[in-house]
Amino acid sequence: MNMTFTKVSKLSALIAISLGATACNETAAVSTQTVDKTIEAQKFIADAEAQMADLSIEINRSEWIYSNFITEDTAALSASISEKYTGTSVKLATQSAQYADLPLNNADKRKLNILRSSIVLPAPLDPAKNTELANISAELNGLYGKGKYCFEDGRCLTQPELSAIMAESKDPAELLEVWQGWREIAKPMRPLFEREVELANEGAQDLGYANLSELWRSQYDMKPDAFSNELDRLWGQVKPLYDSLHCYVRGELNEQYGESVAPASGPIPAHLLGNMWAQSWGNVYDQVAPQDADPGYNVTELLAKHNYDEVKMVKQAESFFTSLGFDALPDTFWERSLFVQPEDRDVVCHASAWDLDNLDDLRIKMCIQKTAEDFTVIHHELGHNFYQRAYKEQPFIFKNSANDGFHEAIGDTIALSITPNYLKQIGLLDEVPDASKDIGLLLKQALDKVAFLPFGLMIDQWRWKVFSGEITPEQYNQAWWDLREKYQGVKAPIARTENDFDPGAKYHVPGNVPYTRYFLAHILQFQFHKSLCEIAGDTGPVHRCSIYGNKEAGAKLNTMLEMGQSKPWPEALEAVTGTKEMDAKAVLDYFAPLQTWLDQQNKTANRQCGW
């Protein structure tokens, strides 16, 4: 027994040694291949990063020139460089896939994933189709930027000028004409957009995604469907507050305009909410606010009273950031930014923030109107600039926000500190209203911030379904209004058909700017604000807190900003809030006194809420 066992054992050992030697040789060969491939991947990442950094400066400059001087020549130059940039991006994204399963360090793995997933409009590998996509993209941008509506009296107005009428007029007929008139500029976009979707979907498939919807949703450090579920969860948290606000506003508009213009039930006609897209309702504040809720001041009027011109408005927004410990903006910012709509040429007036050299050449481009709304928008745009500068020491691929919602949230977080107390500190307001005026201030904020939430969500709900084929081109407009009614409870004021292309009247659709970031930003800003107020030691109601002048809060914020995109967004979120989960409860906490008041008003008026 023992002998047999020993012989078998020896034989087994010999076989094992023999097999082991073979396995060792194979393992060594595989190991050497892996090491070689890993070194190759690291070189690829470094080269890709250098290429993209150089190209980004080139495309930033060409797009800046095009946006500020819209001509056929600048459009051609922009399209040419955009084509080159997109082609390089797609090539690098495609090449990066071969390194996906290698044992790389976390930073390199992250860079590879970002290279592959961060192309918003991926061109097909076919060079002719790449050229076609670049030209379509430039043409869509131009149609929006040059868009004007001409009245019968010969006046031709741009989008900002038309938006000013939407904000100020209370004449339903005039509002309807402007609402309808601006949407005429979008009709020619429809076939271009349809073709753009075909080409970009092909580009997404070349990168290994099912379609552009899957690509867009893959940039959030979680699986695309898990991200969609996260959005549903956050919307579910805030929907009761939105429903209360919608019910109240609809009832007040009905009392003002009557049943034929503003029905007491069903969706609200979209031209009556003070905004070209009914995305924020702050301009109807005067129509819906109760008399005793008036805070006693109007920021637009205060800006005029204190002789704020466009530059002074920007200077004041900058001073908020410097009060937190951030360095002032460079001289070149003031020399190179566009603040006022030129009289001699077409420009893209939509507000945007620019980082031209990935270091210090920061700018904003907007046609500033001297209003409370634009005062807030300026804070928002500077938030982008201060974020851009904070992460300038990161490697190029990480020079971005933790997720795109973070970039949109930072300036708005600062703007939440534009409280009466802050306005008094900077000399705009003489006296701070007492707490009895809080309802008016909260209602104004809710009309801007809470009213926006379903709009911020639905634009990409529509686009994702378009990209995936769930919405076909024959259904573009009907599906748009179905979603607007489902989420926002608003409707088109006149019959629309598939000859119309109402999504194209919103800049971000022809401009190919993803929109879910704005929904996330409207959740995150309240979460950031609440946490920064706690860091600043403010123990009062969160809606009365201003972090202006608090260096400790500024330092905490800067820690997160400097991380850029180098870590998954939950880690960046934790740097300020102490938690890795987005939570809309901060929105409910901020507006808690208002929701109680809204529900009381709706109950007293016996309103039937919902639509």
Model-based region annotation:
Residues 20-23:
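C-terminal motif of bacterial Sec signal peptides marking the signal peptidase cleavage site
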Residues 26-195, 213, 506, 513, ...:
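N-terminal helix-rich structural modules
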